Amino acid sequence: MKDAVVTCFLACIGAAMAVAAIAADATYLGSWKVSGATAAPWADPKQKADTAEQTRLIGKAVVFKTREIAGPEPLACKAAHYKEKNYTADMIFQGAFDEMKSKDKSVDPSKIAASLGFTGNGIKTVETGCEIDFHFVDATTAEVGLNNTVYTLKKQ
């Protein structure tokens, strides 16, 4: 019985260390600030942007914690389950660029992504397990799509 308790204790410590190691490698953890907003490439130019939402979000802090994202709704996430993935341009913003291409074959998702600052074939994306995925332009810049607007977040 004593051996089982010791084994369980050591396994728990090992699991805790593994979680800490994963969290230490997660460069997205920490404080971010919503620094700007632009009309999303998929937005209908005839529709006006929701400036009230932009005013409510721009300048606000978003804090990525180990198991939670603190910040204004809908960016907050009480039970975050992070998964880092590499998306292609056609996959970011819930596949909006691919949908644009399906309607117009001349649309190039890579060029649209580049217009928002994304470079290369693999776009680091953090899936949160909540409504919003965060797409990273670089280590200090992330973008999210929300209600036909692309919001930029800068690491603090």
Which residues make up each language-model segment?
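Edge beta-strand at a domain terminus
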Residues: 76-91, 136-156
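Bacterial N-terminal signal peptides that target proteins for export
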Residues: 1-9
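Short, solvent-exposed loop/hinge segments that bridge or flank secondary-structure elements
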Residues: 34-72
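Contiguous, well-ordered beta-strand patches that form the walls/edges
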Residues: 38-41, 64-132
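N-terminal helix-cap/turn-to-beta initiation motif at the start of protein domains
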Residues: 21-31
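Short, solvent-exposed coil/turn segments at beta-strand boundaries
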Residues: 61-68, 129, 133-142, 156
